Regions:
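Conserved CoA-thioester-binding segment of acyl-CoA-metabolizing enzymes
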Residues: 1-64, 78
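Terminal peptide-recognition signature
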Residues: 22, 26, 41, 59, ...
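Glycine- (often His-adjacent) and acidic-residue-rich active-site loop
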Residues: 61-106, 155
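Short, active-site-adjacent cap segments at secondary-structure transitions
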Residues: 64-68, 126-127, 231
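Crotonase-fold acyl-CoA enzyme core
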Residues: 108-224, 251-264, 270, 277
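Short, charged, surface-exposed hinge/linker loops at domain edges
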Residues: 228-237
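Short beta-strand->loop
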Residues: 238-242
Length: 277
């Protein structure tokens, strides 16, 4: 990336009917994500967490061939801090720091976002791109889409949090099969395994995603967000600790405007009108 280059069109953003749409716009590069697009995605998910005007997030990509083929390593990251003249080209620990500040942060930003995140899977998701699918809350896939755990096929080990996410979705033995062999996984097979929620014709992907996203965006946002956190924590906490967290969140949720509206609408026998707080 040349100094001063305008890269704003490589990640398209818009908010429509309470839905934040994020579109990776690098179809000519397989929608691979360079560091500056990755960092914008991290910021977008973190900001969506706090933004009362955003009540659901959709992540998709341009074109119909690739959703995301992982990190674009052809774009070098800028050097952070100072560099003495006698420093080696590659300092021990630099890869660790790059991982921690990179796709691992992106995975965490998606998982920790209070708002529900839908991936509209428009094509191939490979390597780190598959993490974006696994980290999302819901996935709608075009019928021509596929996922590839390409790491071992290139002599690499899975990164970007894939080893954390994949077995939680498909189970340990199936996760090992997918990672050890790196075979293509069709959208239909991904749906059978529970990675994908719904498969639709490619021409219907945007409309199907819009329907789900706007349905979520018109729902009780806090209740959805706290439900997301409980489900994520269920595989991490002991039974005792999870039940304690559940009780605390139920208590907090009863103080929301939407919780009060839910009770009132039930008593008054009318549809609820959710505000999102």
């Amino acid at each position: 990336m040349s100094e001063g280059a305008d890269t704003s069109d490589e990640l398209l953003t818009r908010v429509e009917n309470g839905v934040l749409w994020l579109t990776i716009n690098r179809a000519d590069k397989g929608n691979a994500v360079p560091f500056y697009v990755r960092d914008r995605l991290i910021d977008a998910f973190r900001n969506a967490h706090w933004d009362l005007g955003v009540r659901a997030v959709v992540l998709t990509a341009a074109g119909d061939r690739h959703f995301c083929t992982g990190a674009d390593l052809s774009v070098p990251q800028p050097q952070r801090g100072t560099r003495p003249d006698d420093a080696p080209e590659r300092v021990v620990g630099s890869a660790i720091n790059m991982m921690r500040a990179g796709f691992q942060q992106l995975m965490t930003a998606i998982q920790d976002c209070e708002k529900p995140v839908i991936v509209a899977l428009n094509g191939t998701a490979a390597g780190g791109g598959s993490m974006l699918v696994l980290a999302a809350d819901l996935v709608i896939a075009a019928d021509n889409a596929k996922l590839i755990q390409v790491f071992v096929r290139r002599g690499l080990i899975p990164d970007a949090g894939v080893a954390y996410l994949l077995p939680r979705v498909v189970g340990m033995h199936k996760a090992k099969e997918l990672i050890f062999f790196g075979d293509d996984l069709s959208a239909a097979d991904a749906a059978t395994l529970g990675i994908v929620n719904k498969v639709v014709p490619a021409a219907e992907l945007q409309s199907a995603t819009k329907e789900w996203a706007e349905r979520l965006a018109s729902g009780p946002t806090k209740a959805i967000g706290w439900s997301k956190k409980l489900l994520h924590d269920a595989s991490e906490l002991s039974r005792h600790d999870l039940l304690e967290e559940e009780a605390m969140m139920v208590e907090l949720n009863t103080s929301t405007e939407d919780s009060k509206e839910g009770v009132a609408s039930f008593r008054e026998r009318r549809p609820p009108e959710w505000k999102g707080w």
